[in-house]
């Protein structure tokens, strides 16, 4: 696949693009949707300078910071998530690298969440090959490490971690036979070509991502992008085009509509589902920011006749 071919897919007439994406989607997944829950297990004081992130220690935001949560409180959240219908429990920690003193505790938490009958996913920053192997042994199913944006636009967003470092972590994850969860953020001021290049980078990863989070910028006051923009710099039609193009390029990946969904109308979310979205974060909180409410999600899923994959098991 070339950059020009990606452009040609994206620029098809919108109805034609959505119909093609829906055809591929139905062939591979049918009418199910994956419900995932996300918990911030360590919040704030991150040494990274990601310009969108309220957890960065470089910026003055109003988030409530905390060290790694105790195991029992995390397991209680995981049980609640399972009871609510989630299939996967995702745990995020605001680290550049996981500290050695916390590694064994995180591995133990992964094992115990797995024992609850949930799929496990973590995002812990960069990890080396040995750490990836140990996480796999602990029972980890997915490791999330987003590229965020194109290689070209990346230095405008992050300077404390090189783009190639992200690729290396994904390589370590793939070599440990952990499923790769990798996507990006739209609406940070990137160009259309940057979005095409992000898709090309995802196609060229060491292993094809099984899960692709598609985020839109949530401008948080105190962050550089939050002080620059009042909303994500992408309209609904561009978002739907991006999702449909992603579905065509990744026919067997779970596409997760992630950050920013709270600000989307039910009609926009419906178009996103038609274009290929088949996974959402389910719950009122998304790390430090609000998510679409459970009641709103239940209403929309019922209206559309979508069944969670937990119901289909």
UniProtKB/Swiss-Prot annotation:
Annotated binding of [4Fe-4S] cluster, by residue: 46, 50, 53
EC number(s) from the headed UniProt entry: 2.8.1.6
Protein name in the entry: Biotin synthase
Enzyme class: transferase
Family named by the database record: Belongs to the radical SAM superfamily. Biotin synthase family.
Functional summary from the UniProt entry: Catalyzes the conversion of dethiobiotin (DTB) to biotin by the insertion of a sulfur atom into dethiobiotin via a radical-based mechanism.
Cofactor(s), by name: [4Fe-4S] cluster; [2Fe-2S] cluster
Subunit structure: Homodimer.
Listed pathway(s): Cofactor biosynthesis; biotin biosynthesis; biotin from 7,8-diaminononanoate: step 2/2
Superkingdom assignment: Bacteria
Gene: bioB
Any one GO molecular function term: 2 iron, 2 sulfur cluster binding
InterPro entries from the UniProt entry: Aldolase_TIM, BATS_dom, Biotin_synth/BioAB, Biotin_synthase, Elp3/MiaA/NifB-like_rSAM, rSAM
SMART domains assigned: BATS, Elp3
UniProtKB keywords: 2Fe-2S, 4Fe-4S, Biotin biosynthesis, Iron, Iron-sulfur, Metal-binding, S-adenosyl-L-methionine, Transferase
Species whose genome carries this gene: Francisella tularensis subsp. holarctica (strain LVS)
Cofactor binding note: Binds 1 [4Fe-4S] cluster. The cluster is coordinated with 3 cysteines and an exchangeable S-adenosyl-L-methionine. Binds 1 [2Fe-2S] cluster. The cluster is coordinated with 3 cysteines and 1 arginine.
Every Radical SAM core domain range: 28-258
Residues that bind [2Fe-2S] cluster: 90, 121, 181, 256
NCBIfam families on file: bioB
GO annotation, biological process: biotin biosynthetic process
Catalysed reaction equations from the record: (4R,5S)-dethiobiotin + (sulfur carrier)-SH + 2 reduced [2Fe-2S]-[ferredoxin] + 2 S-adenosyl-L-methionine = (sulfur carrier)-H + biotin + 2 5'-deoxyadenosine + 2 L-methionine + 2 oxidized [2Fe-2S]-[ferredoxin]
């Amino acid at each position: 696949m070339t950059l020009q071919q990606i452009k040609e897919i994206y620029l098809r007439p919108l109805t034609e693009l959505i119909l093609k994406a829906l055809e591929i989607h139905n062939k591979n997944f049918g009418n199910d949707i994956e419900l995932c829950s996300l918990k911030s297990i360590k919040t704030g004081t991150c040494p990274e300078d990601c310009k969108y992130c309220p957890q960065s220690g470089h910026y003055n935001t109003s988030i409530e910071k905390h060290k790694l949560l105790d195991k029992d409180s995390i397991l209680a959240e995981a049980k609640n998530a399972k009871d609510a219908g989630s299939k996967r429990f995702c745990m995020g920690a605001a680290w550049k690298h996981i500290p050695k003193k916390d590694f064994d505790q995180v591995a133990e938490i992964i094992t115990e969440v797995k024992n609850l009958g949930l799929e496990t996913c973590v995002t812990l920053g960069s990890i080396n090959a040995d750490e990836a192997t140990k996480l796999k042994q602990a029972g980890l199913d997915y490791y999330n490490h987003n590229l965020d944006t194109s290689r070209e636009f990346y230095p405008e967003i992050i300077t404390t971690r090189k783009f190639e470092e992200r690729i290396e972590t994904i390589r370590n994850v793939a070599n440990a036979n952990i499923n790769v969860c990798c996507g990006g953020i739209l609406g940070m001021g990137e160009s259309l070509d940057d979005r095409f290049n992000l898709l090309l980078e995802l196609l060229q990863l060491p292993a094809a991502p099984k899960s692709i989070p598609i985020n839109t910028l949530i401008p948080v006051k105190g962050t550089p992008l939050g002080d620059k923009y009042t909303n994500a710099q992408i309209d609904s039609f561009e978002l739907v085009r991006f999702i449909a193009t992603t579905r065509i390029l990744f026919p067997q990946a779970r596409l997760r509509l992630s950050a920013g969904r709270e600000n989307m109308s039910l009609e926009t979310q419906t178009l996103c589902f038609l274009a290929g979205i088949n996974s959402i974060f389910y719950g009122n909180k998304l790390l430090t920011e609000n998510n679409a409410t459970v009641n709103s999600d239940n209403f929309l899923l019922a209206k559309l006749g979508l069944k969670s994959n937990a119901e289909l098991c």
